[in-house]
Amino acid sequence: MNIATASLCAGLAVSGKFLSKYYQFLSTSQSDEVGFIEIMNMGMTGNDAVACASLGFVMYCVLSFARSYYRFRFSPLRNAPGFGPKSFVYGMFYEFLEAPFMEPPIEALKKLRKGGNDIPFLAYTTLFGSQRLLLLDCDLIKQVFTAPSGRDPMRYPKHYVYLREVVGDGLVVVEGSEWSRHRRIVQPAFQSAFLRDAITTTVPTLVENLVDVWKKTAGTSINLNAHLSIITLDVIGKVAFSHEFNASKLLNEWAECPDKELGEVDDPLISSIGAAFSSSPLKLMLTVLKQPWLEKHLSPAFRTSRNLLNKAADDIVQNAKNIDDPKRRSVLNLMMEAKDDESSKARNKLTDTELRDEVKTFLVAGHETTSTWAHWSLYVLATRPDIQEKVFADITKHSPDDKTILLEQADQMEYLWAFMNETLRLYSPLGLISRVTHKEENFKGYTIPAGTNLRIPIHLIHRHPDHWKDPEDFKPERWFDTEESSKRHKFAFIPFAAGGRNCIGQRFASMEAKIIVANVAKNFEIHLADSMKGKKITFSNFISLKCKPEIEIYVTPRG
């Protein structure tokens, strides 16, 4: 008898209760260590446990495959508008993977619209028949975004199972009543006068350093994303966590030798979060199986990076607790002190673990959003000299001297704000948002099965001809057109999402981005680098909207 046969026989001999429990554990989208420990405590050890676990895993794969194929074969969405039936195994996976971000649905929408039909969504499948809907109808988007967010169970939960393994149970990931508790505690810190004061005193100083570096290296090719990420990283460190990343020193080092690339930020939080997000075949396989939590048990490298990340975030929390100087207080300090009147005394404040998870969450979400927004704003200025001059005229009108622009002045610049809104429309940092149907739904006469993944393609909605006049044209003036604005659906412009779960940091991002862009545009004429001439920009999306190749510019100091 070979080993495989012996293992199978041993597995068949073990308790049916174990197998039932094991399949129940693996098949749920919420499976985690609690269920795993429960199984391991059922009394089996040695070869029996190994054989049973192996058999259980095989059974899970077979039954999941059969269930997925049945859903795929008899799905009510097979005849819905979209890409039509594809391979069960691959679906549209490779088309979406290989094409620029959102290009397949944009092309599909153009073809379907020629028939004059109303297209409320585009249906498609990915690996192993997994159902997806790209929502295009603003009423449907409103329905999803405005569904009550603080109830258990939620009507349209997020189920960000992979992100949860890296950032933990922060505000972006938690669901239902637990999300409501977090939001009530955290939100006052982002609406406080403290935040505006902190932005006003922190950002101009960091931008002054950037301007000085660019003046010293005028005419040199600048990697836009890398340089702006330096600024926004230091901002979120100081304002949100009272933490010094000291990233800006890399700009000064680069100025001494601009032919070299920027160095890496020497901080354990940054290095460990990059390692935790790195891709691997194991990560892809576990994501497909909807069991990403297993990675920390199967991958020593991921386990190490996650432990280092948690340790670095824990240290930031503890250091913030020890701050006595009022001038060094941060958003994190306000979150530590905040209380929720609707929770019990034992639950009315965030625990140290919850604070740690919020640190990781705000670093990933806040840092990327602002740097991406500023990045695309400067790209537009480099490619549209006519708009650059209009922005410059608005800036000099409100800031005629050579002083650094502060937030109070930037708030008065109406054309600048229209320009930045138009940048958000065509180059929204958040390109896509996901939800999942908790139960069967009816969308515009189509039956939507429970467990269907809903994709809200902000990048596509902001370019949809049903919602925008001349959608591909970059026109800041449209934001002064009150008639056009009054006709536009309120959910046609959603750069920070909408409803109860909108981005809590949008005020933070808006204040910071305005100061950065205004000061750069005031001090420099911005041009695309010669290396960019003749190259086509294609979009990609990971955390925020990126592109290939990376944008490079050069600047010429004004007057």
UniProtKB/Swiss-Prot annotation:
User: How is this protein situated with respect to the membrane?
Assistant: Single-pass membrane protein
Q: Which domain of life is it from?
A: Eukaryota
GO cellular component terms, semicolon-separated: membrane
Q: Which residues form a coiled coil?
A: none
Keywords, ordered alphabetically: Heme, Iron, Membrane, Metal-binding, Monooxygenase, Oxidoreductase, Transmembrane, Transmembrane helix
Swiss-Prot/TrEMBL induction comment: Up-regulated under phosphate limitation and by increasing partial pressure of CO(2).
- Per the UniProt record, one Pfam family is p450
The region annotated as signal peptide is: none
Which residues are listed for heme binding in this entry?
C503
The pathway entry for this protein reads as:
Secondary metabolite biosynthesis
Tell me the compartments it is located in: Membrane
What EC number(s) does its UniProt record assign?
A: 1.14.14.-
Residue ranges annotated as transmembrane are 49-71
Catalysed reactions, as listed in the record:
N-geranyl-L-glutamate + reduced [NADPH--hemoprotein reductase] + O2 = N-(8'-hydroxygeranyl)-L-glutamate + oxidized [NADPH--hemoprotein reductase] + H2O + H(+); N-(8'-hydroxygeranyl)-L-glutamate + reduced [NADPH--hemoprotein reductase] + O2 = N-(8'-oxogeranyl)-L-glutamate + oxidized [NADPH--hemoprotein reductase] + 2 H2O + H(+); N-(8'-oxogeranyl)-L-glutamate + reduced [NADPH--hemoprotein reductase] + O2 = N-(7'-carboxy-7'-demethylgeranyl)-L-glutamate + oxidized [NADPH--hemoprotein reductase] + H2O + 2 H(+)
Q: What does this protein do?
A: Cytochrome P450 monooxygenase: part of the gene cluster that mediates the biosynthesis of domoic acid (DA) and derivatives, natural products with neurochemical activity acting as ionotropic glutamate receptor (iGluR) agonists, thus being neurotoxins causing amnesic shellfish poisoning (ASP). Catalyzes the conversion of N-geranyl-L-glutamic acid (L-NGG) to N-(7'-carboxy-7'-demethylgeranyl)-L-glutamic acid (cNGG) via three successive steps involving N-(8'-hydroxygeranyl)-L-glutamic acid and N-(8'-oxogeranyl)-L-glutamic acid as intermediates.
Q: Which family does it belong to?
A: Belongs to the cytochrome P450 family.
Q: What is this protein called?
A: N-geranyl-L-glutamate oxidase
Record organism: Pseudo-nitzschia multiseries
**Name of the gene this protein is made from:** dabD
